[in-house]
From Swiss-Prot:
This is Cell division topological specificity factor. One of its GO terms (biological process) is cell division. Pfam families: MinE (PF03776). Prevents the cell division inhibition by proteins MinC and MinD at internal division sites while permitting inhibition at polar sites. This ensures cell division at the proper site by restricting the formation of a division septum at the midpoint of the long axis of the cell. The keyword Cell division applies. The lineage of its organism: Bacteria, Bacillati, Bacillota, Clostridia, Eubacteriales. The keyword Cell cycle applies. HAMAP family: MinE. It comes from Clostridium beijerinckii (strain ATCC 51743 / NCIMB 8052) (Clostridium acetobutylicum). Belongs to the MinE family. Keywords: Cell cycle, Cell division.
Length: 89
């Protein structure tokens, strides 16, 4: 019965957020438009706020690009999200 449940189940918000973050990190070339970053910010905060009380006004999210010695460019999503409390405790 668990097998059939796993075939028809929707991904959890945690899994969706994780997949979105992976896509951002994979996108290591090119610029990310500010409107896309804002949309990512909104969606991440929506998922996180289901589990944690956060200070939305103090959230900082940015994308940093770095180059290494071999000329490879990498990007990192940096999120500073102040936590008020964990829900369900």
């Amino acid at each position: 019965m668990g097998f059939f449940k796993s075939l028809n189940s929707k991904p959890t918000p945690k899994e969706v957020a994780k997949d979105r973050l992976k896509l951002i990190l994979i996108h290591d070339r090119g610029e990310i438009a500010p409107d896309i970053i804002e949309k990512i910010r909104e969606e991440i905060l929506e998922v996180i706020s289901k589990y944690i009380d956060i200070q939305v006004e103090d959230v900082e999210i940015s994308v940093n690009k770095n180059g290494d010695e071999e000329g490879e460019n990498t990007s990192a999503l940096i999120a500073n999200i102040p936590i008020k409390s964990i829900k369900g405790r």
